[in-house]
């Protein structure tokens, strides 16, 4: 699939599209799961997952850790980045998520479970972007 001349831009576009799909799913499902969720939270999550897709797309050029010198394949890179980004999200909106989780089946669980969700989403985004476009230095050698 060639949307752009650059392989890196193609990877970023594919990853953003997959992130947008996850964001749209969350946009639809959040009010079903969390009755008190407002429209601002829904749009924030939509844009958040699109941003995670862009971030994972850009980071696809790194398939070897620059400092620790070990392989950084998609099945490590995607979950790490998705989990890290959702960790940051939980730090920003911990109180809001805790409040929303009180009256649901998730009552009593920690909002930090969103990190696991981010790892799964990150894995899927990076898997699809890597299978469709590739990763590593070949992305910048056009």
Pin down the residues of each PLM region.
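Juxtamembrane/disordered regions of integral membrane proteins
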Residues: 1-142
